[in-house]
From Swiss-Prot:
It comes from Mus musculus (Mouse). GO terms for biological process: intracellular calcium ion homeostasis; negative regulation of osteoclast differentiation; phosphatidylinositol dephosphorylation; regulation of bone remodeling; regulation of nucleocytoplasmic transport; regulation of phosphatidylinositol 3-kinase/protein kinase B signal transduction. It catalyses: a 1,2-diacyl-sn-glycero-3-phospho-(1D-myo-inositol-3,4-bisphosphate) + H2O = a 1,2-diacyl-sn-glycero-3-phospho-(1D-myo-inositol-3-phosphate) + phosphate; 1D-myo-inositol 1,3,4-trisphosphate + H2O = 1D-myo-inositol 1,3-bisphosphate + phosphate; 1D-myo-inositol 3,4-bisphosphate + H2O = 1D-myo-inositol 3-phosphate + phosphate. The keyword Lipid metabolism applies. Pfam families: C2. This is Type II inositol 3,4-bisphosphate 4-phosphatase. The keyword Nucleus does not apply.
């Protein structure tokens, strides 16, 4: 129902004093003192003794809130309460809240207009009365409560009273809370709250951190009665995230860098036979086109300004493919009289999917399976490596790229410790160097590397083997290497006229030998140093003579001897490591060349689709991780769980298994699964730029999250030292719309069933790790508070039950996630209708189960949260789903559809048909 306000500019003048109306520029306006990032002003409303137009009529009242701006001197509709039926003393559960950036001052006047709604379906209502007040009057009132007379439009007859009570979220004051009843007519007016925010939400040091992530917050305020007839306050907040565009741009930049590097590595393979050289040229041509396309997309994304999210109307735009649809934070802050303030966050986002690519042939799950099946079942004219081997090659290359710089860094730290002549520091640096080097050596033990070296040898000009190599060829079978024709010497491997497989064993074994030399030298230096110290304190003459001899041997070297003696060994280690890396990279690059040569252009198109879906999923994950970290910084148990176990990330999917949404679900399943290759690292921010930084390549990414210095210092040592923090993404999907009904009756729901079963096993795996790694005292307390085992069993039973539209799966998965301190996501096609229904239902269920919401008010609370009228009648341009991405519109355009009054699809079709008929009749 749209509230229509007539003569807004005239009424604005009417309610303004003459001085303000005529000379607004000469007036100094007084800002409202507020907590940073908190709403500037919040109040709730109640009416008393309303006079009905007809004596025997029961009123159905709604209040329209409008703002008279002192500068523009115009009246702007701002929001509405819900409709309260059948009483002359309505107490409204929906309050009014003004976000931090809203231009409101003490001189701003608020107009309250009360209507009697006669027929909601036909938008029939009548004006009852109105009143107005200045914001400063409310703030400075003795009890921060105003009682205003409602008058008719001519300003004459009094038709009742409206009471305005200021709200400050926080602790409740002593008051008549025990006298609140569940009867609407008997409820008392709002009680005052002191302004106290949860510790993790206050504090100026965190503001840059959150402001770098969230934008354009829009708040809603409610008050609901508890089961013991007391009030609890609820604030809903919806925020956009700047990460919607920041993360895709970071990721595309990494893709470009990685692909350019791969192309260069292909060029540096050296001379190849004509057959392989032609294949390489073809691959490079396609890869260059791919890089150019990514560069064009990045350029277009860099031009985007204005809104921080992509609306669903833009989900098919090519330049915005990598950007998630409707990424928002939906936060519910609850203050109840008995319990500590609580926050409940859900990230809402459209299902990660390649909408521009389309779903005619299915989504990633089906396309990848078909691609790999065809590759297995087809013979080719060149050496073939299975998908497992190409994946292994990428994994080894990823390990090389991660470990080589780490080893170099630890080697330099070892030399620094040596120059400082610090035994303890030397031991610590040596331990880290040894661990990373052992991992490095172990990575090259894989048989694939040996096979790839041989395959590359055969691809050289004249390099022909008597039989083709295989990734699983044994050492005995590879004895034919000595029968190969002579190959001219090059910088690339092999360096012998005949391929010598044992040479590779010697090369990578040299890395281990170099490390052993360093370990032996460090042990010797530390031992001599300890003997020297013991000799200095010796008492016997015999010991003194021995110590004197040892002192001579030690002092014959200058004190920087440690550095000088270790430096050549470190150089040798780096040289050996460099030789191994060069050979391994070339051989494994050749494996990838074979994959690309076979699969063009399908392989690159699948890579593009996977990159698009992963980008959308990653943007949401980073947003959720940062928000979860921010709200839990003062929770030692959470921080310990973060670095000990990692975080579970639960995605609630509401896609049907019908038509295009099957492809979306297949895309989404792969995109969320790919998030397992993402790790987080927390660092100290050294500047005002606290946006997350992304590093890595397609097989492994690290997201660097920056924290202010004061916050960073309070973290556990393991996190401060840069330990990688892992996530465990899981997806549970239950289709709930009409299309799912068709799928269950006439189609196939096996995709949904298999996804739910697979991800249940992942949840069980996480639970096992959680119970194993967390401290016993924490586990003991945790088990006392939560029957997680019972929840898991119940979830498993529901998954096995194969019940139609079994939303119990969603509720159980969400509960398990919250109990495990996880990150919650809710997704449907566009994060609109189904998502909003799910989120509001979940919020009301939490209020009922965790905060004692009165059972008689559950439906009314749900209606309040779903009512579009509580934020006023939005124009088409105010709807975030119809606005242009780059338009600079008022903040109201961003209000999230969680609060919209939603209709089912068939009713929407009827409405469209009727609208078209009316238009035709009008113009005829």
């Amino acid at each position: 129902m749209e509230i229509k306000e007539e003569g807004t500019s005239e009424e604005g003048q009417h309610f303004l004093p003459a001085a303000q109306a005529n000379d607004p520029e000469d007036i100094q306006f007084t800002s409202i003192q507020k907590i940073p990032n908190e709403p500037q002003l919040e109040f709730i409303l109640a009416c008393r003794d309303l006079v009905a137009p007809v004596s025997d009529r029961k009123l159905n009242t709604v209040v329209q809130i409008s703002v008279i701006h002192p500068v523009e001197q115009t009246l702007t509709r701002y929001s509405s309460t819900e409709i309260v039926e059948g009483t002359k003393d309505p107490l409204f559960l929906t309050g009014v809240t003004f976000p931090p950036d809203y231009p409101i001052y003490e001189e701003t006047r608020i107009k309250l207009t009360v209507y009697d709604v006669k027929d909601k379906s036909h938008d029939t209502r009548s004006f009852l009365g109105c009143a107005s007040f200045k914001v400063g009057e409310l703030l400075k009132s003795k009890e921060q409560l105003l009682s205003l007379s409602l008058r008719t439009s001519d300003g004459g007859k009094v038709v009742g009273t409206i009471e305005v009570s200021l709200v400050k979220m926080g602790e409740i004051e002593d008051g008549d809370t025990d006298h609140i009843t569940t009867d609407v007519q008997g409820q008392k007016c709002a009680l005052m709250y002191e302004s106290t925010a949860p510790e993790s939400l206050s504090g100026k040091e965190n503001l840059p951190f959150m402001n770098a992530v969230l934008r354009n917050p829009v708040c809603k305020l409610y008050r609901f009665p508890t089961s013991d007839n007391k009030w609890m306050r609820i604030r809903e907040q919806m925020s956009e995230s700047i990460l919607s565009f920041h993360i895709p741009k970071e990721l595309i930049s990494l893709h470009i860098k990685e692909d350019l590097c791969r192309n260069q590595e292909l060029k540096e393979l050296g001379d190849l036979s004509p057959h392989w050289d032609n294949l390489r040229k073809n691959v490079l041509s396609h890869c260059d086109q791919m890089v150019t396309m990514y560069q064009d997309i990045l350029t277009e994304l860099s031009k985007e300004t204005g809104s921080s999210f992509k609306s669903s109307s833009s989900k098919g735009e090519k330049t915005l493919e990598f950007v998630p649809v409707n990424l928002h934070l939906q936060r519910m802050q609850v203050h109840s009289p008995h319990l500590k303030d609580a926050l409940y966050d859900v990230i809402t986002v459209g299902a990660p999917a390649a909408h521009f690519q389309g779903f005619k042939n299915g989504g990633l799950r089906k396309l990848l399976h078909r691609f790999e099946t065809e590759r297995r079942n087809t013979g080719y004219q060149f050496i073939y490596y299975s998908p497992e081997n190409t994946a292994k090659a990428k994994e080894v290359l990823s390990s090389i790229n991660q470990l080589q710089p780490l080893i170099a860094t630890h080697a330099d730290l070892l030399l620094t410790s040596a120059s400082q002549r610090s035994p303890d520091s030397l031991k610590s640096s040596l331990k880290l160097l040894s661990e990373k080097t052992e991992l490095f050596v172990h990575a090259f033990k894989d048989q694939l590397v040996r096979s790839a070296l041989l395959a590359l040898y055969t691809a050289r000009p004249g390099g022909i083997l008597k039989k083709p190599p295989s990734p699983n060829v044994s050492t005995e079978e590879k004895s034919t290497q000595h029968d190969t024709p002579q190959l001219r010497r090059q910088d690339s491997i092999p360096h012998h006229s005949d391929y010598d497989e044992e040479e590779w064993d010697r090369v990578w074994a040299n890395v281990g030998k170099s490390l052993n030399c360093i370990i032996a030298k460090v042990d010797k230096l530390i031992e001599r140093d300890s003997h020297n110290e013991e000799g200095a304190g010796g008492s016997s003459s015999k010991d003194g003579e021995a110590d004197h001899t040892l002192e001579d041997s030690i002092t014959s070297h200058p004190r920087e001897d440690w550095y000088e003696q270790l430096h050549p060994l470190i150089l040798t280690l780096k040289e050996c490591m460099g030789e191994v890396v060069n050979r391994a990279k070339q051989s494994l690059t050749f494996v990838l060349l074979q994959e690309l040569a076979y699969s063009l252009p399908q392989c690159l198109m699948l890579t593009l689709r996977r990159d698009i879906v992963f980008s959308q999923a990653l943007a949401g994950l980073v947003c959720g991780f940062i928000i979860k970290l921010h709200t839990s910084l003062h929770d030692p148990g959470f921080l310990q769980q973060l670095h000990t176990v990692g975080l579970i990330v639960q995605y609630e999917g509401l896609l049907s298994t019908y038509s295009d949404e099957i492809g979306m679900l297949e895309d989404m399943a792969v995109g969320i699964s790919d998030l397992r290759k993402v790790a987080f690292k927390i660092t100290e921010a050294t500047s005002n730029d606290v946006l997350p930084v992304l590093t890595g390549r397609r097989e492994h990414y690290v997201v660097e999250v920056k924290l202010p210095a004061t916050v960073f210092e309070s973290l556990p040592l393991q996190i401060k030292e840069g330990q990688l923090l892992h996530v465990y993404p899981v997806l549970f999907n239950v289709g709930i719309n009409e299309q799912q009904t068709l799928a269950e009756r006439f189609g196939d729901v096996s995709l949904q069933e298999s996804i739910n079963q697979e991800n249940f096993e992942l949840v069980q795996e996480y639970y096992s790790i959680f119970m194993e790694k967390m401290p016993p005292d924490y586990i003991s307390h945790f088990q006392e508070q939560t029957d997680l085992k019972g929840l898991l069993d119940n979830l498993h039973q529901n998954i096995q039950a194969k019940k139609r539209k079994n939303v119990e799966i969603m509720w159980l998965a969400a509960t398990i996630c919250r109990k495990l301190n996880g990150i919650r996501f809710t997704c449907c096609k566009s994060a609109k209708d189904r998502t909003s229904m799910s989120v509001t239902l979940e919020q009301c269920s939490i209020l009922r189960d965790e905060h004692q919401l009165h059972k008689d008010f559950f439906i009314r609370a749900l209606d309040c949260m779903r009512s579009r009228q509580t934020q006023g009648a939005l124009n088409e341009s105010d709807d975030p789903e119809t606005g242009c991405l780059t338009d600079n519109k008022p903040t109201s355009r961003h209000f999230y559809p969680v609060a919209l009054l939603l209709v089912s699809s068939h009713l929407l079709v009827v409405w469209l048909i009727l609208s078209l008929a009316l238009l035709l009749a009008k113009y005829q």
